Amino acid sequence: MLKSPVSHLRSNSYRERRNKKKMHLSENEGVEGNTFVVTGGLGYVGAALCLELVRRGARQVRSFDLRNSSPWSDDLRNSGVRCIQGDVTRKQDVDKALDGADCVLHLASYGMSGKEMLQFGRCDEVNINGTCNVLEAVFKHEITRLVYVSTYNVVFGGKEIINGNESLPYYPLDDHVDAYGRSKSIAEQLVLKSNGRPFKNGGKKLYTCAVRPAAIYGPGEDRHLPRIVNLAKMGLLLFKTGERSVKTDWIYVENLVLAIILASMGLLDDIPGREGEPVAAGQPYFFLRPFLRSLDYDLPKFTISVPVAVTLGNIFQGVYTVLYPWLSKSWLPQPLILPAEVYKVGVTHYFSYLKAKEELGYVPFKSSKEGMAATISYWQERKQRSLDGPTIFTWLAVILGMSSLFAAGWLPEVGPVPFLRALSLFFFRTMTMVRAVFVISVALHVGEGIYAWSLAKRVDPDNAMGWFWQTSALGFFSMRFLLKRAKDHHQA
């Protein structure tokens, strides 16, 4: 099982920093003794947030998610988090989950990357209609605090932003190249415009704010880095988009969790000296730090311009639009890149968190260097636990080569078989030799597979069968990876 994204937080160092701030009396202000609902609570950030709220003494933490399980669900239940399965697009589910809550942290969303980005209707349904359902339930149950986890895409659409801040205007809705950015922008504006709205019974008001993170990283992150690593492992990170000087924002998971909790504190209306005037009410905040990636696999050797990459992204978008009925199927791989993703990686855009620092006392819990070190360590450990192997091009070469030999040696002369037979005879002279080469190759592959299984039982027992099948298919091209792992195992 993957480790919890927030297994522990060093509260002493955090408390020392927070005591210097004037907004709150303690790190648990507004958390201790309160009931929280985290929509999207079984996700990577949502689970980390739930665990941290429990650690800070929340009376009850509810995880509200469409799924009934995730890699972190056992940790949540063992920590006392109440996991509620429901759909944010169903009013009755939302109403039931939010009943009796003191604060709602709305993280549930759809369409951030990959195939999800092309499911426009689902993006609107979850991001806009779902947020409307949350707002409606918040007013019905007179919940005074709502933190909306938005995205920097509400102000970014492919044009360079250098050290941007909260004064940037919303990116025009009609100019967004993806449904995710557009729908999140609409939802954020709905949330912020609801700030200060009184409840029907009078007296109390709803206070809202929005947090605008960028791409999230950290140990166990399950969306961005796995996709990058898988592409690198298959040898499909063929090019880099944009200039070498491009800078983009990433945020470490623990820093984002801290940001969301501080934002919820900033909506309190009973802070000494600020009664009735929550510092964060109606405000959006950026919580970001520049992030440089480092991978053990081969990095892209070529660079293409943003316009060329956008054209390539449009081609993939067109192909996958035709495949729309099957976008939710697991067997359909992720598109290599889409237009919105081109802008995210190929155009400089980074932001200042000065406003969050001044108004909420936000100081990143971990530096980019610390966060990157923890993430790399996690991926190195994960790589050691998984089956390693050659790129997809090696797979294609071996499979095509063996298939061609089999076709040349045994299949009737139809289709490409005459050409393959002529090519095989050019190298091996006789049909007997062609067939012998194929049989010997198969025998050698199976023999190597058996040896790989035997060796893996000693150095990588969890993946022994995987090594057998992969080496039986690829022979030496797989065996060399196992031999390297065996060498590392003996040196450890």
Give residue spans per PLM region:
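N-terminal Rossmann NAD(P)H-binding glycine-rich loop of SDR-like oxidoreductase domains
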Residues: 34-56
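Conserved Rossmann-fold NAD(P)-dependent oxidoreductase catalytic core, especially the SDR/UDP-sugar
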Residues: 129-182, 199-202
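NAD(P)-dependent short-chain dehydrogenase/reductase
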Residues: 193-268, 291
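Aromatic-rich, lipid-facing transmembrane alpha helices and their immediate juxtamembrane interface loops
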Residues: 277, 384-492
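Amphipathic terminal alpha-helices
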Residues: 14-15, 24-25, 35, 348-359, ...
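Conserved C-terminal active-site "lid" loop/helix of NAD(P)H-dependent oxidoreductases
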Residues: 253, 312, 317-325, 330-363
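NAD(P)H-binding glycine-rich loop region in Rossmannoid oxidoreductase-like domains
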Residues: 81-129, 137, 141, 157
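Mid/C-terminal beta-alpha module of Rossmann-like enzyme folds, strongest
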Residues: 266-336, 373, 383-387
